[in-house]
Amino acid sequence: MKHFAKVSSKNIWVIHLAKVKYNIDNDSSFFSVQCNSSNNLNNNNFNENNLKNNNNRNGNNNNNNNNNNNNNNNNNNNNNNNNNNNNNKKNDLTDTINQKKKKKKRRVK
């Protein structure tokens, strides 16, 4: 695979593992660049950075999931507490009603 490109003041990143020829400022002369070794380094760095980024993303996702789970657990606990409180209030009410009924019955006797 041979590629031709004009060289400008900007950096050119070569992705292909191949011998590359550059055309210098419309000059008819060419020079060959063997870019296998530098490409491998670039690709390795790129892959390492991607792995790090993916690991960081995964770590963040895990943290977010844990936080969401904790929030859900807290919400469930709050709901349970509210339900318990409501049930206790109902029980208290029925107790007081029953006590009043008993008292009334006693008076009738």
UniProtKB/Swiss-Prot annotation:
This is Putative uncharacterized protein DDB_G0284715. The lineage of its organism: Eukaryota, Amoebozoa, Evosea, Eumycetozoa, Dictyostelia. Residues 99-109 have a biased composition (Basic residues). Residues 39-88 have a biased composition (Low complexity). Residues 36-109 are annotated as: Disordered.
